[in-house]
Amino acid sequence: MKFYNIFVFVALILAITIGQSEAGWLKKIGKKIERVGQHTRDATIQGLGVAQQAANVAATARG
């Protein structure tokens, strides 16, 4: 029973400490992930444009 009380107390102290700390490192990781997503989106849009142009050229060549 004492172990449970000590565990709850330590967990509470850790939660308070972590909650008040700045989430700078987490924010940096989030921004990097967001940037990768944006680059992937932009590359996909550009690739679709090139594929559409190639399809138009192929359709024009067939007559």
Swiss-Prot record:
GO terms for biological process: antibacterial humoral response; defense response to Gram-negative bacterium; defense response to Gram-positive bacterium; innate immune response. It is found in: Secreted. InterPro entries: Cecropin, Cecropin_insect. PROSITE patterns: CECROPIN (PS00268). One of its GO terms (cellular component) is extracellular space. Cecropins have lytic and antibacterial activity against several Gram-positive and Gram-negative bacteria. Belongs to the cecropin family. This is Cecropin-A1.
